[in-house]
């Protein structure tokens, strides 16, 4: 506190004091302000273990002045008193400072006499450095996902993305001409020509979010299908007819896929999606394939059979789109991983699949309404039951 004032005393021309009195912070010794007796420390039992530094000329002068100013201004803070005392000491002449300088010399000589081996050791100031916790958005969502509210957080994000994707699909100029067909694992690898750039930007953003969700051990996202950048191990073939980025319905599936192991989609309770709006239902329907790809072996045949009620309630909530939407797949059963022709046929239009009657019937249905059917057929095929295609 008094370092500025001591520097002033150091630069005074009449100050013939030793550097010991003038260097270093004076607040560490001398009694600080109005107390403490002039000579060496160790006068009381409390101060016997630590010897204080001798006071300099400014401290000798300010000791009486501080007490006087504190009596005149009882509400004034000690720091304000020190500032005023320092300003007054600067404007004082050498003749006025001389008696205090001589007194400081005497005190220093007495201190050296009492403590010949004294060496100034500055007191260590322990400053606790506060570490700031820097959490990114993904880290915050991971922390929320570890607790009970992870499903609600991911569901809120997925509903917003799904609603935006549905609106963008209906408004895109090339929406009726694009060829987007559901993959057997829920990955749709097509994009509408009217908004390829928007879909690519959205896919890049969702890849980062999926990285955060997929790497969380509690969310079950360590599945090889959870990362959109990894190639599917069951489908190593290329798609020359579909060079566009991922389908925008994949955005909702990416958000819903990490929480499929929790009580989200396979809980056999249709009341979970009973009150959601049309955009949210569309996002939930688009997430059907994503929920299938991350569901573990723990989803037994009973859970698959019970989930048909939830799928039926979900399908009734979804409104049909205009008739210009792309045709739905002709069949919805899950093919064997080794059958390459069966897998390729999932990407071809329904008219080329060899079943024109089924293609004409499926063309009237909605893209969103066909996704629950595809999921039902795939889930039933995995569990060894009959595909429920009549819903």
From Swiss-Prot:
Q: Where is the protein situated, by its record's location annotation?
A: Nucleus
Motif segment (9aaTAD): 342-350
List, alphabetically, the SUPFAM superfamilies matched: HMG-box (SSF47095)
In this chain, the stretch annotated as Disordered covers 1-52, 214-249
Assigned keywords, A-Z? Activator, DNA-binding, Nucleus, Transcription, Transcription regulation
Q: Name one GO molecular function term.
A: RNA polymerase II cis-regulatory region sequence-specific DNA binding
Q: A Pfam family matched by this chain, by name?
A: SOXp
Which InterPro entries does the entry link to? HMG_box_dom, HMG_box_dom_sf, SOX_fam, SRY-related_HMG-box_TF-like
GO biological process terms held by the UniProt record: cellular response to leukemia inhibitory factor; forebrain development; forebrain neuron development; forebrain neuron differentiation; interneuron migration; lens morphogenesis in camera-type eye; negative regulation of transcription by RNA polymerase II; neuron migration
Q: Spell out the Gly residues composition-biased ranges.
A: 26-44
Q: Does the keyword Nucleus apply?
A: yes
Q: What cellular component terms from Gene Ontology apply here? A: nucleoplasm; nucleus
Biased composition of type Basic residues is found at 224-240
Chain residues forming the annotated DNA-binding region = 51-119
Tissues in which the protein is found: Mainly in the developing central nervous system. Expressed in developing urogenital ridge.
Major subcellular site: nucleus
Q: Is the keyword Metal-binding in the record?
A: no
- PANTHER family documented for this protein: SOX TRANSCRIPTION FACTOR, TRANSCRIPTION FACTOR SOX-1
Function noted in UniProt: Transcriptional activator. May function as a switch in neuronal development. Keeps neural cells undifferentiated by counteracting the activity of proneural proteins and suppresses neuronal differentiation.
Q: What is known of its domains?
A: The 9aaTAD motif is a transactivation domain present in a large number of yeast and animal transcription factors.
- Name assigned to this protein: Transcription factor SOX-1
Which lineage? Eukaryota, Metazoa, Chordata, Craniata, Vertebrata
Gene name of the encoded protein: Sox1
């Amino acid at each position: 506190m008094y370092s500025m004032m001591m520097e002033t005393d150091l630069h005074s021309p009449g100050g013939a004091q030793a550097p010991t009195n003038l260097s270093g912070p004076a607040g560490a010794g001398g009694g600080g302000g109005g107390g403490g007796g002039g000579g060496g420390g160790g006068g009381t039992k409390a101060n016997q273990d630590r010897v204080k530094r001798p006071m300099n000329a400014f401290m000798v002068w300010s000791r009486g002045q501080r007490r006087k100013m504190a009596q005149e201004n009882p509400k004034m803070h000690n720091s304000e008193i020190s500032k005023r005392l320092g300003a007054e000491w600067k404007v004082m002449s050498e003749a006025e400072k001389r008696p205090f300088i001589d007194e400081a010399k005497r005190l220093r000589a007495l201190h050296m006499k009492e403590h010949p081996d004294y060496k100034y050791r500055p007191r260590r100031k322990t400053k606790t450095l506060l570490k700031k916790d820097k959490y990114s958005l993904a880290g915050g969502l991971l922390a929320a996902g570890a607790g009970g509210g992870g499903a609600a957080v991911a569901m809120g994000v997925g509903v917003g993305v799904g609603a935006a994707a549905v609106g963008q699909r209906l408004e895109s100029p090339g929406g009726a001409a694009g060829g987007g067909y559901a993959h057997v694992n829920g990955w749709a690898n097509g994009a509408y020509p009217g908004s390829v750039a928007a879909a690519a930007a959205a896919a890049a953003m969702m890849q980062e979010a999926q990285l955060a969700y997929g790497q969380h051990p509690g969310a079950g996202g360590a599945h090889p299908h959870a990362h959109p950048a990894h190639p599917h191990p069951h489908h190593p073939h290329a798609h020359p007819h579909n060079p566009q980025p991922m389908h925008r319905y994949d955005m909702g599936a990416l958000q819903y896929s990490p929480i499929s192991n929790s009580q989200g989609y396979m809980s056999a309770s249709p009341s979970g999606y009973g009150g959601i709006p049309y955009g949210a239902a569309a996002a939930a329907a688009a997430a059907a394939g994503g929920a299938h790809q991350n569901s573990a072996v723990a989803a037994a045949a009973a859970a698959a059979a019970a989930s048909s009620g939830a799928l039926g309630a979900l399908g009734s909530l979804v409104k049909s789109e205009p008739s210009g939407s792309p045709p739905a797949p002709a069949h919805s059963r899950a093919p064997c991983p080794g059958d390459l022709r069966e897998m390729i046929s999932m990407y071809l239009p329904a008219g080329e699949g060899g079943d024109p009657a089924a293609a004409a019937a499926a063309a009237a249905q909605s893209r969103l309404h066909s996704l629950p059917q595809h999921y039902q057929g795939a889930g039933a095929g995995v569990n060894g039951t009959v595909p429920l295609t009549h819903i």
